Every structure is written in C-alpha cells, then in structure tokens.
C-alpha cells in the first residue's frame, strides 16, 4: 500500500468522503475483477512489445460514464478495436496486443479543484467514480457509493468483453460483419472491406489445408485486456490481492490487467508511484513535454528495479508541435542507460484545443502528425515504436475535427457526448489505424534494408 506520508496531489483536494472505511472494507472482500495469471500473461505480451515482436493497441473512452454504460456501446467499442487490430496486424506482420481503456476508466485528474460558470464556483467533475457531471451543488459532492457502482459496472463490462473475445465475435471469418452501419460507404470502410477480402482469401486457403476456426482457436478467439489510470488509490488498494497460487507470489492490482500513472501524478514522491512500485502487473507511465530525462530514469529504476521486459511501458504524450524535440532526449537517455521499457504514442492528450464554439476538440491533422513524429524519432534512434494509445469510441460522435469523413467545428454540437475529453469516432479510428499500419510497414521495410546493409 502507498505510504501515508507520501504526497498525493490529486487525492488531497477535498475528496476525503470518497474513502470512507466501510466502502473500502466492502470492496476489499469482493471478488477480484481480473486474476494474477491474466496480468502475468499480459506482462509477457508486453515484453514482446518492448522487443519489437508485437505491437500494442490501447484504446477506449477518455472517461467511462454510468449513463453510457450499456451492452451496445461496449460491443461497438470492442468491434472497432478488433477492426483496428486487423488493420495493424496486416500492416506490421506482428501480433497486436489489444488493451481497452475500459472496465474501470471512471476517474480523471483535473488541473483545477473548482469549476466556475457564470460566477458560480463548484468542485470540478472528477469522473463518475467520484461525483456527477451536472453543474449542481449536490451532484458535485463526492459520493462514496460510486466506488461500488464502478466495481459493479466494471464487472459487467469485463464479463461481456470476455464473452465477445471468446464467444465468436472475434472469429476472423466474420471480418465483414464488424463494420458499423454509420461507417459504411466511407473511404475507410471501403479500404477495410478490401483488406477483409484479402484476409478471407487467405483463410479459405488455410481452410483447404485443414486449419479452420473449429480446430484452430486463434481464428475464432482473441486475447483482450483492460486498463485504466490508477488514480483513486483507495479503490485500487481495496482491490489489491496477494497471489497465493503460483510460486511467483506477489501483490497484484485486480481492478484491471494494466494500470498507468498519469502525467499529473508521476512525481517520484507521489503516492501513485509508491503504489505502482508494489504491484506485479504490467504498468504504464505517461510522459509529457515537461518530463526531464534524469527524472524519467529515476522513475524507471524505481518502478522496474529488476529491469524486466514487459513490466513498464512509457506512454509519450507530447503534442504534435513538440513530439520530435521533447521525445528524442527521453529516448536517448533511456537507450544510453540500458533500461528496458516499451514505448507507446498517445497522440490525444497533447493536442486538445478549444474550438470557437467553446467545445474542447482535437484535430485529426495534429493527432496524425504526432503519430508520424513518434515513428520518425524511433526510426532515427533505431528503437522500437511499440504501440499507440487512443481515446476513441464505437459511437458516431462528433468530438474530434477533421478526417476524410470530415467533422468540422460547426458539426461539434451535433453529437458531442463525451464526459471529459473529445474522442475519435469509428471512422476516424479506422483512418488512424490505416496510417499506423502504413508507418509500421515502412518501418518493417527500413529494418529489412538495414539488415541487408549490415550483412
């Protein structure tokens, strides 16, 4: 558990009521949401990501909400992630590790403890795990019962995701059925349909050779993992369990397979770092433009003292204008140190702007520019661009502007449903997947040329 004396900037801002002891006790006796062996398996998969043997796709809601928690939304997000993974697999010729920002992403750090509208000041909305989005006194009061609601909704989401992953929805013979209705007819849907036809032809050949979904599990099932920011530590600690089954005994967070530390809570004296240091799950660390290379090395050594591949993934969120200038010194320092990490690109959080209409939005051009910059730096440094981390949804929202099926600022109000930051819709998500696939294919070609040149 996190030491009491360690500074915890995000949790000390008037949220004491959230952590009432009876709620913690109730959570501590509830069954784990995930199991140690699942987290251990993901750690092995993340080792492959760090070594360039697999590629990470991490995506889902900025902040899940109780209002949007239903089977259709979960299914549609899962389906878009499956489509993106197929596109990335085709481009990279690598296994794609699929991790959702799902089943627990109900809290958000805020830069200000208060929100002011028309001279009225109320506590900031911190996600449905803490309080309600409605701008009213009672709604903004922290409510400890919400922790139990998050547990229940996360459990039902995980149950559904496991059913989807192993119950036939991931069957590769159903590739053509994954397209969402509102995506049909777009350029991305046409490109996806062409790719699906190529894969179907390959499957027909494999079927003729005796490999079918009935006798080959990999053709009908997929591994799917969950993750969220480990922000509210009393929730995380109450769901931390000791693994007593295997020889590799240790403490595991059982609220998700993977947790990450946000850019606002990554100071080395934060309670969040102390908590993450003590769990055996694979973990992520967000790195923003203010990240100092020496501080980063100290954090890596604290979070991964045994220097194990798969333990720690650095999630870079620099902004399109700064990605090359800010990311290169970090990669240089880590490479020189010999420390083993995975590298992942979050092109969302550094590119949030306010539209003239007042809506927060993100521009597809900026998002794509940061992804390109991420790959450019890694190609130059001969390091591994290990993954991408998107905020997206399977819903037909209008929250990010741009893309081939263009959403402009005038459209933002049409279907702006996010409870926090703007998300990519399914069409925009597929467009980005095709971009990343092209970059991965180019990276593969460059690597092959280097190997030939050396030999």
Question: Over which residues does each language-model region extend?
Answer:
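General beta-strand structural signal in soluble alpha/beta enzymes
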Residues: 57-59, 97-99, 343-345, 390
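Amphipathic coiled-coil/heptad-repeat helices and related helical stalk/stem segments
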Residues: 2, 268-269, 323, 327
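N-terminal "leader" segments that precede or initiate the main folded domain
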Residues: 20-75
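Short, small-residue-biased leader/transition segments that mark boundaries at the very start
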Residues: 2-19
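Non-transmembrane, aqueous-exposed alpha-helical and coiled segments at domain scale
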Residues: 296-305, 311-343, 349-398
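Ligand/cofactor-recognition surfaces for anionic moieties
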Residues: 51, 286, 455
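Structural motif
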Residues: 1, 10, 274-275, 380
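Active-site-facing alpha/beta catalytic cores
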Residues: 64, 68-319, 362, 370, ...
């Amino acid at each position: 558990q996190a030491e009491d004396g360690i500074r915890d900037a995000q949790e000390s801002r008037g949220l004491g009521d959230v952590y009432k002891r009876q709620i913690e006790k109730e959570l501590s006796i509830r069954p784990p949401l995930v199991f140690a062996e699942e987290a251990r398996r993901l750690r092995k998969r993340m080792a492959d990501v760090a070594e360039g043997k697999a590629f990470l796709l991490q995506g889902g809601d900025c902040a899940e909400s109780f209002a949007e928690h239903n089977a259709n939304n979960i299914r549609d997000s899962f389906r878009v992630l499956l489509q993106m993974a197929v596109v990335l697999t085709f481009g990279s010729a690598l296994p794609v590790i699929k991790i959702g920002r799902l089943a627990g992403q109900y809290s958000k750090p805020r830069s200000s403890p208060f929100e002011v509208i028309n001279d009225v000041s109320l506590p900031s909305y911190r996600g449905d795990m803490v309080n309600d989005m409605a701008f009213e006194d009672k709604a903004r009061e922290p409510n400890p019962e919400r922790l139990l609601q998050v547990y229940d909704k996360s459990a039902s989401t995980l149950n559904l995701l496991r059913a989807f992953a192993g119950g036939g929805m991931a069957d590769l013979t159903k590739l053509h059925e994954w397209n969402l209705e509102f995506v049909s007819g777009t350029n991305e849907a046409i490109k996806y349909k062409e790719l699906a036809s190529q894969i179907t032809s390959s499957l027909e050949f494999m079927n003729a050779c005796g490999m079918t979904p009935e006798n080959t599990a990999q053709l009908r099932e997929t591994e799917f993992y969950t993750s969220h920011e480990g922000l509210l530590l009393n929730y995380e600690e109450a769901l931390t369990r000791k693994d007593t089954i295997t020889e590799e005994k240790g403490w595991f967070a059982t609220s998700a397979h993977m947790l990450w530390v946000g850019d606002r809570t990554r100071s080395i004296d934060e309670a969040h770092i102390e908590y993450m240091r003590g769990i055996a799950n694979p973990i992520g660390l967000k790195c923003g433009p203010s990240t100092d290379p020496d501080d980063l090395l100290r954090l890596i050594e604290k979070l991964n003292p045994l220097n194990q591949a798969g333990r720690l993934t650095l999630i870079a969120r620099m902004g399109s204008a700064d990605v090359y200038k800010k990311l290169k010194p970090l990669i240089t320092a880590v490479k020189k140190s010999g420390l083993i990490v995975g590298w992942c690109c979050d092109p969302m959080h550094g590119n949030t702007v306010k539209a003239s209409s007042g809506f927060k939005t993100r521009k597809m051009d900026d998002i794509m520019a940061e992804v390109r910059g991420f790959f450019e730096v890694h190609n130059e440094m001969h390091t591994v661009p290990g993954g991408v981390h998107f905020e997206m949804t399977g819903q037909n929202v209008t929250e990010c502007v741009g893309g081939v099926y263009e959403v402009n600022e005038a459209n933002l109000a049409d279907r702006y449903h996010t409870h926090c930051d703007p998300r990519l819709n399914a069409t925009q998500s597929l467009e980005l997947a095709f971009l990343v696939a092209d970059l991965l294919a180019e990276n593969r070609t460059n690597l092959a040329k280097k190997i030939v040149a050396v030999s």
